[in-house]
Amino acid sequence: MILNSISLDYVLNMNNPIIIDIRDNYTYNLGHIKGAINIPYYNLLGNYSHYLSKNDKYYLYCENGRQSLNISNRLNSFGYNTFNIDGGYERYLISKYY
């Protein structure tokens, strides 16, 4: 297993990171990290080459970081450069950025 978690602070202080919320559309529309795009887990898993380029870095999150860690590790094994945002949306809600 590849451990590739990264802190929320680190990502949100970057210049134009590509942040992907892998939660379902309904949950995303209830609230999400500022600047995040929504690609639900099963859409991303089923068609990752349609959404991602191997030339970019992606920062993924879900509700608590578990599901995004799983898919991030899987995508990395396919040659993509992805990182899991540690703690997911729950961490964002208690952060200074919310």
Which residue stretches match the model-derived regions?
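Rhodanese-like catalytic fold shared by cysteine-dependent sulfurtransferases
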Residues: M1-Y10, M14-P17, D24-K57, E63-Y98
